[in-house]
Amino acid sequence: MKRLFILSVVLALMLGVAVAGEDEIKPESICPKTLMKDSCLTCHSYPTFILKEINPESRYEYPITNMRLVGDTAHYVLQTVRAGEVQDFFDYILWHPFVKKIVIEVHSPGGSLFDGYKIVGMMQHMMAQGYVIETRVYGFAASAGFLIAASGTKGHRFVSPTSESMWHELMSFTMFAIDTPSDSEEKARVLRHLQDTANEWLASVGNLTMSELNEKIRKREFWLNGREAVEFGFADGFLK
């Protein structure tokens, strides 16, 4: 029994030393916070799992899959309106000073208005830094997608003649809710405020006034083909 006890102690000490040794010779590529077990994307970039502390390698270590670099131009295909994804794209560009131009191809049914606002705000910031942002619509840009497509650099917003764009009144959804008259009035007030903000911005980048936009979307959707997008000032020319 005594020998068995001594043997158990020796084995425990040996195992302890082995574990400690593994920790000491742990490869530097393994995140010291997660050990690549849980939440590894907190410290590592996808899909290569290089530590985020390492600057992304030009031309292949992209933060998102729907972007690419061609010469001095960064291309991005916006299919879902996600501000975080666009921010990763812009942050990547700022790491690469040789990029002079940004092309955003919008092919999206829209999404969150607030994500759309943030994306437009980031676009304005990048343009203020000297970047030209060209927007392209080959197929479909609706709702917040339309807001983004119309917000590129003036003279650099292009559409296909067969493309379709759409703008509409804002909508809110509440399931299984019981509203009082004052609740409904407050919701209407907030929606009106948000609608006016969006329409005011579109009026500033297009040829329609706020009142004209309000009239065109009142209880219906405002659809524009490529020719109409250029005619109403939300695009500057046609893709060739």
Feature-to-residue mapping (PLM):
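Bacterial N-terminal signal peptides
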Residues: 8-16
